[in-house]
Amino acid sequence: MFSFSNLFSSLLVAGTILAAEAWQKQHRPSLDLSPARVAVRFEPVVIGAIAAPARVAGAWAVSAGDNRFGGISGLGIDQGKLLALSDGGMLMAIDRPGTKQPTVTIRALPAVPGPATRKIGRDSEALLRDPAGRGWWVAFEQVHSLWLYDRGFTRTLKVIPVENADFSDNHGIETLADDHGRVRWLAESTGASDAARLPDGAIMLLERRIGVGGVSSWLKWGGQRLALPLARSDNPEALTAEPLPNGGTRLWIMTDNDLKPWRRTLLVAINLPPAH
């Protein structure tokens, strides 16, 4: 039989949980923003097959001797290293797999939209090299905005507030793309988690769907769609591309472990043949 007392109790419990989560979000311990350089480990892993002519060139579970490593939300290439961005506003310059005694250099963005030592104030979701060569763009949630930093991430060059009726605190810009010299953004609601400009000028989207069975993900560009052979527990958040000597393209993809020690941060290298 329906009971108003049971309904009231359920609502009270739900309200208490939501209030506790909100309090926890606002009162998390201050983040450690000190720079560090630590060893990074690449453990080869086997993933599923990928449709030809694409080829998996390598896959690794990546870990480092710093508990701030992970939570990847953006990826680029800078000075020969992989440059990853976490959703806590931390930059990670990672030596590539195969490097002798590889390391990762971790440092904080020099300025952020909100309280610098709180996750809510530095919720960075996307990274893009400025098409004009001035530096790097970073997209933020919570305080929805685009920030342009100089090439060395030492200072802020420009801040653009972004307003959209569909945004909520934790759902806003998810992807940045270089659209023939223009900076374009995509919201999380589009399903895109990152984008990369290919050497031939095409824009490739990294898309995903999160359902009851886990995460499914794929790459989409120029009318093509390529399913990614990742585990349903892997959440791909970051994509970048670079040309190969043979005219092909190397794609680098990283997953977000949500900074949970029991989840892996996966790095996947995929080679595409030269475009015809």
Annotate each language-model stretch with its function.
Residues 2-276:
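Sequence/structural signature of beta-propeller domains
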